[in-house]
C-alpha cells in the first residue's frame, strides 16, 4: 500500500481553523531521508509519520520542514484522528512510542468524529524570570509591568517541552500584540527556552486566551499549541490561580483567533497535594483532504 498523505486541522472541528498538520499513514517503507523530504514538501509546521511498533500500538515520527522533533501535540491529535478514521476505531486507549518516549492516547468516538486525548509528560517549573530578563520579555512584547497579572511570575513551565508563561490582565488586548521577534530570539538564547506564551483568563471562567511566539525556531506564531496550553494548566495549579476541587482542574484554552485560525484545547490537570501531577490535552480534528503518493518512493 502506498503512503497516504493527509492534511488535517487539529484542535478544531471546523476546516481552515486550528493548527494544520500533515499525516502520512502507513509510513513503514519510507526512509528517514524520504520522511524529511515529504515534510519539507508538505510545508506544515509538523508532519507525523505512522509506523508499526513492536512494543506499542503505533510508533510516530515527527518532522518539521527542516528537522525531526521528539513529539508535537497538534500533530499527535491529527495522527490519531486519521488512524482512528482509517481503522474504524471505537472508544479505546492506545499507546504510542516516539522519540519522546511512550504515551497514552485516549480515543473517544462521537457522531461527528473523534476526540483525541494525549497524556503529556511530568509537569516542571524553573525559577521565575526576574529583573532584567523579566523586563526584557515584557518590553519585547511591547507591554508594561502594569499589563501583567499582579503577584504572579513570568516563568518557564514544561510538560515535556518548555514554554515561558506570561500571565496578562483580562483587559489587555491580546490580539493586538505585535512582539519584537529579534528581541524574543535573543532572549530565547539567554534562557534556553524557545516559546513565549502570553495568556489571559476569561473573567469568571476556567477558560483562557493565549498566543504562542517562537521566532528562535522559525515559528513567528503558532496557531494552537498543545505544548503551551498543557504547561499553562499545570502553572495555573502550581500558583493556585483558578478554583478546583483538589483533585482535578479543567481549563479550555483558546488560541489562534489573531491568525484567523481559532481552535480550542481542553486541558485536564490531575492534582496531588495542591500541585499538578499529570496533564492531559484533548481536542477534535478535521481531515481536509488526503491523497495517495503519486511517485515511486
From Swiss-Prot:
GO terms for biological process: biosynthetic process. Keywords: Isomerase. One of its GO terms (molecular function) is isomerase activity. Disulfide bonds: none annotated. InterPro entries: Phenazine_PhzF-like. It holds the Pfam family PhzC-PhzF. The active site is at residue 46. It comes from the Bacteria. GO terms for cellular component: cytoplasm. Its EC number is 5.1.-.-. It is an enzyme of class 5 (isomerase). The keyword Kinase does not apply. Homodimer and homotetramer. NCBIfam families: PhzF_family, PRK10281.1. Belongs to the PhzF family. This is Uncharacterized isomerase YddE. The gene is yddE.
Amino acid at each position: 500500500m502506498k503512503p497516504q498523505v493527509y492534511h488535517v486541522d487539529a484542535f478544531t472541528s471546523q476546516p481552515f481553523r486550528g493548527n494544520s498538520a500533515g499525516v502520512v499513514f502507513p509510513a513503514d517503507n519510507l526512509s528517514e531521508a524520504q520522511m524529511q523530504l515529504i515534510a519539507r514538501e508538505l510545508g506544515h509546521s509538523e508532519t507525523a509519520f505512522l509506523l508499526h511498533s513492536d512494543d506499542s500500538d503505533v510508533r510516530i515520527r515527527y518532522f518539521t520542514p527542516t528537522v525531526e522533533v521528539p513529539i508535537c501535540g497538534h500533530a499527535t491529535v491529527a495522527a490519531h484522528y486519521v488512524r482512528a478514521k482509517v481503522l474504524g476505531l471505537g472508544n479505546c486507549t492506545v499507546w504510542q512510542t516516539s522519540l519522546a518516549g511512550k504515551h497514552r492516547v485516549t480515543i473517544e468516538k462521537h457522531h461527528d468524529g473523534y476526540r483525541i486525548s494525549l497524556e503529556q509528560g511530568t509537569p516542571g517549573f524553573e525559577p521565575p524570570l526576574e529583573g532584567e530578563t523579566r523586563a526584557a520579555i515584557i518590553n519585547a512584547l511591547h507591554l508594561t509591568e502594569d499589563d501583567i497579572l499582579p503577584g504572579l511570575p513570568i516563568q518557564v513551565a514544561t510538560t515535556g517541552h518548555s514554554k515561558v508563561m506570561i500571565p496578562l490582565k483580562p483587559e489587555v488586548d491580546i490580539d493586538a500584540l505585535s512582539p519584537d521577534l529579534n528581541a524574543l530570539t535573543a532572549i530565547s538564547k539567554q534562557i534556553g527556552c524557545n516559546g513565549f506564551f502570553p495568556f489571559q483568563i476569561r473573567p469568571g471562567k476556567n477558560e483562557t486566551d493565549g498566543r504562542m511566539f517562537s521566532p528562535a525556531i522559525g515559528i513567528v506564531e503558532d496557531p494552537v499549541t498543545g505544548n503551551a496550553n498543557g504547561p499553562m494548566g499545570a502553572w495555573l495549579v502550581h500558583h493556585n490561580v483558578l478554583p478546583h476541587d483538589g483533585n482535578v482542574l479543567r481549563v479550555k484554552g483558546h488560541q489562534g483567533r489573531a491568525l484567523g485560525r481559532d481552535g480550542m484545547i481542553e486541558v485536564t490537570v490531575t492534582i496531588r497535594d495542591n500541585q499538578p501531577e499529570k496533564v492531559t490535552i484533548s481536542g477534535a480534528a478535521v481531515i481536509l483532504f488526503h491523497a495517495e503518493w503519486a511517485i515511486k518512493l
